[in-house]
């Protein structure tokens, strides 16, 4: 009788513990988050186009692979960027990675908070961790970028 009670309670405990664990498919992508309304480059940068300005940053997937970001090198406002060309770099405890611009245009603003707090790229890649704001010189370049469904 005692053995049956022990077996029953063990089986129940196993059922409960496996029911609360999330299931991850080995075929699923490991992107932490992909947001609708943004455009994505194959090189893992994102663009949010609002009016005449496009905000650019690196994706959650990119920051996750880099690890803890410790330094960000960005250009100055007033300069220009060219699609598929590097405009800055992100240094982490693991590696340094160039950041490519997904669009061409004039840099109208740089996120100065990143010089003091580069970890914003890790904690908030789509909000506080944005890198530059660009006035696109060729807005049709946005059409060649991926939406959220294509990126995942």
Swiss-Prot record:
The keyword Mitochondrion applies. GO terms for cellular component: glycine cleavage complex; mitochondrion. Its cofactor is (R)-lipoate. The gene is GDCSH. Binds 1 lipoyl cofactor covalently. This is Glycine cleavage system H protein, mitochondrial. It comes from Flaveria pubescens (Yellowtops). Its main location: mitochondrion. Belongs to the GcvH family. The glycine cleavage system catalyzes the degradation of glycine. The H protein shuttles the methylamine group of glycine from the P protein to the T protein.
């Amino acid at each position: 009788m005692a053995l049956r009670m022990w077996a029953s309670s063990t089986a129940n405990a196993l059922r409960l513990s496996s029911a609360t664990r999330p299931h991850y498919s080995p075929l699923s992508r490991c992107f932490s988050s992909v947001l609708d309304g943004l455009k994505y480059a194959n090189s893992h940068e994102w663009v949010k186009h609002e009016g005449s300005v496009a905000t650019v940053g690196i994706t959650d997937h990119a920051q996750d692979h880099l690890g803890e970001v410790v330094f960000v090198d960005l250009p100055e406002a007033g300069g220009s960027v060219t699609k598929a060309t590097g405009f800055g770099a992100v240094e982490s405890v693991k590696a340094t990675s160039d950041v490519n611009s997904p669009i061409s245009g004039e840099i109208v603003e740089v996120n100065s908070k990143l010089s003091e707090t580069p970890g914003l790229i890790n904690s908030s890649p789509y909000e506080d961790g944005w890198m530059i704001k660009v006035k696109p010189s060729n807005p049709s370049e946005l059409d060649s970028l991926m939406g959220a469904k294509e990126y995942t």
